[in-house]
């Protein structure tokens, strides 16, 4: 009788442990699926799927009047195609990773940073004083960019184009239209960098 009880207790303990490990495995699997779906594998930033979710969430909060100020920033590397053609895609990837690091170091504590396409990035900053956050972030970005470009034996400099808008429903109507406005300013900046007007 005692042996039967002991065997029963052991079976229950083993069953409980198996269920616990299954739960842990399911959680790990769930975390891994989430990471694959919403995290950019190359840079570690949130990816386009995460960006689209955040854009939708922000639009809903704006529609409800729950957001006072919204800053939208867009960033794009200059000359990635030339870097890839001249030095190879792995060298270009290193520049993309460095670009992501610089943007995240400049804006990551204040906002949400995303890699939305090959060499294109976006940042949403929600809260008070977004213009100041932008100005401070761009100063930091330029400082980090200059620091990287002083790397010995660097084959190609890193040049990051940027543009921003502060959301205003009268001007833009939707977050999507505001993003287009930030895109336009970013491409103007990229052209100025190519012409040497911005260092």
Predicted regions: what is each one?
Residues 85, 124-128, 167-168:
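Residue-level recognition of strand-loop junctions within catalytic nucleotide-signaling folds
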Residues 91-110:
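Active-site-proximal alpha-helical element of nucleotidyl cyclase-like catalytic domains
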Residues 95, 122-143:
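Short helix/loop segment flanking the catalytic signature motif in cyclic-nucleotide metabolism enzymes
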Residues 33-53, 75-89, 97:
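Conserved nucleotide-binding and Mg2+-coordinating catalytic segments in signaling enzymes
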Residues 112-115, 156:
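A short pre-motif secondary-structure segment
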Residues 2-41, 49-60, 111-112:
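Signal-transducing coiled-coil linker helices
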Residues 89, 134-138, 142, 146-153, ...:
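Catalytic-core segments of nucleotide cyclases and related cyclic-nucleotide turnover enzymes
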Residues 54-87, 114:
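Active-site-proximal structural segments of metal-dependent nucleotidyl cyclase/transferase enzymes
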